[in-house]
């Protein structure tokens, strides 16, 4: 059993992506999860399901380790996509980088926050009634113009503050 049989809210988090440049820092995911699931917030006491590909579990380890074991579950390629979709359909919110999992969340009908920096959110945002793109304070064009090279392995999500993401999530869930 992946999810607990409780009446608690469910927050699904996709803290990884296929390119480090568009991956929000683990520390920021940790802070956002803490704020959203904390006392008095919209997902107070939520169970957190972390999702990603099998080769992304190590990248997600800091986020996993920050959540008490009894408050979290994980799927990193160890379940079918149908199982992931069933979990997304039960979720109160999906929070993650622009990725295939973000698009699955939007398709499931789950309120979805997609995080964007070096991708054009106008093309790749979560397309659904409950989908929202939250992008860095820098535009796509400014990020691309200021990166080291087109093969850059630098993180390009530096200008996306936790407060902006949490505010968007609260508005969406409310």
Locations of regions flagged by a protein language model:
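Donor-binding and catalytic core of enzymes assembling or modifying cell-surface/extracellular glycoconjugates
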Residues: 17, 26-117
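Short, conserved glycine- and acidic-residue-centered signature motifs
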Residues: 22-25, 158
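Nucleotide-sugar donor-binding patch of glycosyltransferase catalytic domains
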Residues: 64, 74-75, 106-173
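Short hydrophobic-acidic sequence motifs that mark active-site Asp/Glu residues
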Residues: 10-12, 33, 133
């Amino acid at each position: 059993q992946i999810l607990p049989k409780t009446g608690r809210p469910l927050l699904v988090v996709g803290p990884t992506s296929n390119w480090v440049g568009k991956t929000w820092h683990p520390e920021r995911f940790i802070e956002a999860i803490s704020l959203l699931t904390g006392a008095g917030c919209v997902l107070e006491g939520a169970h957190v399901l972390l999702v990603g590909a099998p080769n992304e579990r190590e990248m997600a380890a800091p986020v996993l380790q920050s959540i008490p074991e009894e408050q979290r579950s994980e799927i990193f390629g160890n379940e079918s996509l149908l199982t992931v979709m069933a979990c997304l359909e039960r979720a109160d919110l999906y929070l993650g980088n622009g990725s295939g999992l973000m698009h699955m969340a939007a398709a499931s009908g789950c309120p979805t926050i997609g995080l964007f920096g070096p991708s054009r959110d106008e093309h790749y945002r979560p397309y659904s009634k409950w989908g929202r793109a939250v992008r860095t304070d820098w535009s796509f064009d400014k990020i691309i113009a200021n990166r080291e090279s087109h093969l850059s392995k630098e993180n390009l999500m530096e200008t996306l503050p936790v407060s902006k993401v949490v505010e968007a999530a609260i508005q969406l869930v409310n």
